[in-house]
Amino acid sequence: GEVIQPDKLNRYLMMGELSLDGSLQPIKGALPIAIKARELGFEGIIVPRQNALEAAVVNQIQVYGVENIKEVIEFFNGKQELTPTIVNTREEFYAQQSSFDLDFADVKGQENVKRALEVAAAGGHNIILIGAPGSGKSMLAKRLPSILPPLSLGESLETTKIHSVAGRLQNNTGLISKRPFRDPHHTISTVAMTGGGSYPQPGEISLAHN
């Protein structure tokens, strides 16, 4: 007991998975947790370093990323300063919106299929591709995200929260800047499609939101 001086504790929310060696492992849902911490009036939130960029998307609250429990104890005892993680949300969001590894413009021919994909992309419709192996279904589907309308900042926040709760965000990731594109196989289970399970998780329908 008495490892930490209690006067600071009620001003901060702390989240993380503590390993036996004292290191902190990343968690799911850092973004919605940070939003709730701000709503509840916390001065700051302390999370594993891998979650810091994700949580720092939320403004008006200090976000600190730490490697281990020792850093947290020394911070609360005034022996170590922690540097808050700062993200220029708008700048980062718009800078990443137009970068795609695969481009729809690379596809030659297939005019009828391309037209169908363009209509689906513009109207936000679902689409199913049926054809013989090697006919270009996967190649076309992988390039569809490059013609989807850009996300708004509000849509990006909604989408990032869902993927955060599902544990789908990569470490050291901020806002999702491109529309999610999901291509489930026809053998997918009902739970995987709609969500649920013993430990409920968002399904493909939720992951495709926006």
Feature annotation, model-predicted:
Residues G1-I128, A132-S138, I176:
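Peripheral, non-AAA+ core regions of ATP-driven protein-machinery
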Residues V3, N77-E81, A122-N126, S146-P149, ...:
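Generic secondary-structure signature for well-ordered alpha-helical cores
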Residues G16, G65, D183-H185, G195:
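Flexible glycine-/small-residue-rich
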Residues E118, G174-R182, T190-N210:
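Conserved alpha-helical scaffold flanking the Walker A/P-loop in AAA+ ATPase domains
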Residues I128-T173:
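Walker A/P-loop
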